[in-house]
């Protein structure tokens, strides 16, 4: 900046963060499992980033069942805050910047996108489900993040591990994919990343180049997927067109709802703001804060009774489509439920109160209703997090 004339001055990237990442692909469960087995046998640590919570749970349960000797942990966003903090501490101890060989060796983490955010984690091996290119680049930042020797101990000199390799769990490659190319192998994710053409372009770019250099390749990678001149295969064109139309509609909504800074705080903007209105700051699936309570010995208490913020420690975020209101409960007196609800932040107005009873399987369960008013039983434990009945039954089926 010179006086009142702005200018741009490029800064050199630090040598410690400039690197080449090799990319390979695994188009089956068995291929991913083999890479994890190789990591364990060589005394390395690994992470598999999955695109949905159910997919992460499924991988965690199957791997634990098939390899009981492995040291595996599960990390996603659907844990009560106290449990999530405990998991974060374990994850940082095993994979954080100060972790050593003894803490890292043979450890495996199955996670969702939560590992991309704020935590300083460093894995020897990294596997990710196929995602848009910008997320792939971001996730790769957790691979060989710090300089280490061949055993995984921190060092100051050049990293002594093999070249960082990012494995992408993906559909089988096709030059001419059908509309089912991504939907069939990843049925839970098809509505998370709706533009399947962009996913195909991401895979094509990385296949063609065999990897990428950062930061040199960043612009070419982004433009190679999001550029307007890129050609989408006919089989994926419709899904891409619909996704892009939806994104344009969301952009229009955002434009109409932006604040007019020149008018100050008035009610003349596109959307009137009331004293207690819900004012979301982003578009997307709405989420709800769920306040967990446990019924023990005739008392209803926060699930994690840890003053002074017991209710906050007992809260978990979940999609409103899955849980929108408290369901009927015949075992806990209504007056006790109402009295407990009064203790919640804002008396529970902006969330769902979920009293839980311990089931015969030692998992906590409670009744709720989804966004359409359909009743459901929800389940919670500190290992798997909060589950709908469908998710829980699927989990139990895998464990049998």
Regions found by a protein language model. Name each.
Residues 1-2, 21-25, 84-87, 101-104, ...:
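Short linear motifs at secondary-structure transitions and domain/linker junctions
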Residues 1-53:
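Conserved interdomain linker/interface between the two RecA-like ATPase lobes of SF2 helicase motors
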Residues 16-21, 68-70, 105, 162:
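A short helix-to-beta-strand connector/capping loop
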Residues 34-46, 54-89, 93, 98-99, ...:
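C-terminal helicase lobe and adjacent C-terminal extensions/tails of nucleic-acid helicase motors
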Residues 47-49, 108-110, 127:
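Structural motif
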Residues 101-116:
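Conserved two-lobed SF2 helicase motor
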Residues 120:
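Flexible glycine/serine/alanine-rich "lid" or loop that lines and gates the nucleotide-sugar donor pocket
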């Amino acid at each position: 900046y010179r006086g009142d004339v702005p200018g741009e001055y490029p800064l050199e990237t630090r040598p410690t963060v400039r690197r080449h990442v090799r990319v390979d692909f695994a188009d089956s469960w068995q291929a991913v499992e083999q890479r994890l087995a190789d990591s364990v046998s060589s005394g390395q640590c690994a992470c598999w980033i999955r695109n949905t919570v159910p997919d992460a749970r499924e991988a965690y349960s199957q791997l634990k069942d098939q390899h009981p000797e492995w040291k595996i942990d599960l990390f996603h966003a659907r844990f009560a805050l106290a449990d999530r903090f405990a998991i974060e501490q374990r994850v940082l101890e095993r994979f954080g910047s100060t972790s050593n060989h003894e803490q890292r060796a043979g450890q495996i983490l199955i996670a969702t996108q939560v590992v991309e955010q704020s935590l300083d984690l460093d894995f020897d091996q990294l596997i990710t489900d196929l995602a848009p290119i910008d997320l792939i680049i971001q996730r790769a930042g957790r691979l060989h993040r710090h300089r280490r020797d061949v055993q995984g101990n921190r060092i100051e000199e050049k990293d002594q591990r093999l070249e960082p390799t990012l494995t992408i769990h993906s559909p089988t490659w096709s030059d001419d994919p059908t509309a089912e190319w991504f939907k069939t192998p990843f049925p839970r994710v098809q509505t998370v990343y709706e533009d399947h053409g962009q996913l195909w372009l991401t895979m094509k770019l990385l296949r063609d180049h065999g990897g990428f250099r950062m930061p040199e390749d960043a612009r070419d990678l982004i433009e190679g997927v999001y550029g307007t001149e890129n050609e989408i295969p006919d089989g994926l064109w419709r899904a891409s067109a619909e996704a892009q139309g939806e994104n344009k509609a969301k952009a229009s909504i955002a434009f109409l709802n932006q604040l007019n800074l020149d008018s100050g705080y008035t009610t003349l903007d596109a959307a009137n703001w009331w004293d207690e209105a819900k004012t979301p700051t982003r578009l997307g699936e709405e989420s709800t804060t769920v306040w967990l309570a446990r019924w023990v010995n005739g008392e209803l208490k926060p699930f994690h009774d840890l003053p002074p913020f017991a209710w906050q420690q007992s809260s978990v975020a979940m999609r409103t489509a899955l849980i929108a209101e408290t369901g009927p409960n015949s075992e806990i007196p209504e007056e006790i439920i109402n009295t407990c609800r009064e203790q919640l932040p804002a008396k529970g107005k902006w969330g769902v109160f979920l009293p839980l009873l311990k089931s015969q399987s030692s998992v906590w369960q409670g009744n709720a209703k989804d966004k359409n008013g359909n009743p459901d039983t929800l389940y919670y434990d500190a290992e798997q997090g909060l589950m709908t009945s469908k998710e829980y039954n699927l989990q139990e089926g895998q464990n049998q």
